[in-house]
């Protein structure tokens, strides 16, 4: 279970993202380098004695899709991001595949 202070900060960051959309920048958002998707970003916040990152991307419908989160404090930064990006890429691809399937069904 994610501690309440982390949930609160995640919700606050998600609300900022909803208000500002793709224009939200540092220190709240940064690009995730190494992703298979050029539009992969990370929400950045500190909470519960942790340094949290949430991988997300704006999909073709311009919705922000939050994909995976993790506390990078105390971890090898390289290993942390490799794992975060791999999971985010996989989940985002599944999301895009579902959108494509829905679009095909509507035709």
Question: What is the role of each PLM region?
Answer:
Residues 1-51, 60-64, 71-107:
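Basic, Lys/Arg-enriched alpha-helical interface segments
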């Amino acid at each position: 279970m994610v501690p309440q202070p982390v949930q609160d900060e995640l919700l606050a960051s998600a609300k900022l993202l909803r208000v500002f959309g793709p224009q939200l920048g540092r220190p709240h958002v940064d690009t995730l380098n190494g992703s298979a998707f050029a539009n992969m970003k990370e929400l950045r916040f500190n909470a519960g004695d942790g340094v949290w990152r949430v991988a997300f991307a704006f999909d073709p419908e311009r919705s922000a899709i939050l994909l995976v989160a993790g506390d990078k404090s105390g971890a090898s930064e390289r290993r942390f991001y490799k794992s975060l990006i791999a999971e985010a890429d996989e989940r985002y691809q599944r999301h895009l595949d579902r959108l494509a399937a829905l679009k095909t069904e509507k035709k």
